[in-house]
Structure formats: structure tokens, C-alpha cells
Amino acid sequence: MDKKEDTKFKANPYNFNNVSISEEQVINIMKKLNITDFQLNNIEFYKTAFIHKSYCKLKDYEEYEYPGQPCLPLQETSYETMEFLGDAILGSVVSSYLYERFYKIHKQNEGFLTKLKIRIICGESLCKLSKCLSLQNYLVISKHIEDNCEGRSNSNILEDVFEAMIGAIYLDTNYKIAEQFIIRVIENYFDFTETLLIDNNYKDQISRYFQRVFDDGSRPIYKHIKKDDIFYCELYHKDKLLISGEGGSKKKSEQDVSKKALIYFNVLT
């Protein structure tokens, strides 16, 4: 864990760049996707969907005085529960969508569908989809995250808020609208042709690399640490630590560290 990560919940969090998403902005996102039967009921769901834990009321922040308006005050709740809900809905909708589109019509097998699903819901794809919707503009993050941890370009946070946005839509409306949102985003912004040509299952790639390079049959070893609701993952070759990664879940942290390992071995650039 690097020094930046160790201090991100200790530095002064107040960030004048934060702006909560408005009703008009939520409605415009849905209009952009041509979801005409959307009716916004409670803007608080959507505001919460963009609140990173670094901007919540934490014990380590008690020494810092709120600077007043127009700076947003620290928040009570982060997006993490909505992210959990959105992640489950996303997986269900994508599975059904791929079944209807690629099995019923083209008779593609389970292996093909699984591979495609993994690529749609991987962190890299969700980060890109967040950017397509300009969700980074509505992030509520600490000044430390803004200045030192890639801020509004942080791929892990953008991945999280895409899932949290799905959770917010579901809680505010219903499953049908959340499903429409996911499908419209996929059909508008997801390049299936490019995806089928690119292998971004980094954990699988590093496993194949180990099999090819190391004659002793050794496999990558993953060790996990959870701190402040972030999953950190270390990748070892035998007893040697190669690289560290992180993510919003155990699976995401494994993909992150696997990608970094491929860069470490000059497989990726």
C-alpha cells in the first residue's frame, strides 16, 4: 500500500470542486439515452450514488473545520450500498441481454456468452461507460483524492459510480427502468466488435503467462487485504512479491493487480 493510499482518509477532505448532481442533470442523462418513460421521484438517491467514502463524516476528519458555502459539507452516506445493488442488477440484465441477442438469434454457446459478459462488466468497460455519460462531473470526492489519486479520472471510482447509478435508478423507479438504462448504454456506447478482438481478462492472461514462462508449474498467488472498504491485492511468484493492486471488490482488485503484473512483465504496455 503506498503512502497516498495510507493518508487519503486523514488529509483535509473539503473540496470546492464538488457539485451534487441535480434533477435536471439526471433527467438529461435519461433523455440522452431516449428513456422516455423515466420519472424522477427522489433526487437524494442519485446524489448518494456519487458520494465517495472519502467525503463522508469520518473520525479522522473531526479536526478539520467546515469552510462554509459554496463547499459541500461532508456527507452521511457513501455510494457503496448502491454500488452493491447496482452490481447485482447489472449482472442479471447483461446475462439476459446476451442470451436474447447472441444465443436465441445466433446460437452462441455458454462459453462465448460468459466471455462477453466478463468483458462488458469489467472495470475498464464500466469506467469508459461512465465517461460516455460524463458521470465524472458529479463525483463527490475529498480534496486528497482529487489531487493525489487521479481524482475524476480514477478508474475504480468511475466503475463504482456506474454501478451505483444503476442502484439509484432501481431504488427511485423500478427494475424495468434500470434495465432500460443498462441496455441503452450498452447499445449506444459498447463496441462489441472491438471487445471480441481484445482480451481484457487480465487474471486469465497472467495465469497463461506463468504457465508459459515458468517451467516449475508455479501459478500466480494472490493475497488480499481489506482496509477502509477497499480491497488491496498482492500478486506473488512463489514467495516474491511482484506487484500490488486495488479495487472496490476482491474480484476487481485481482483484475487490477493482474493487469499491473502484465505490464511488469512487459506483456502489456
Where are these regions (language model features)?
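Double-stranded RNA-binding/processing signature
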Residues: 1-269
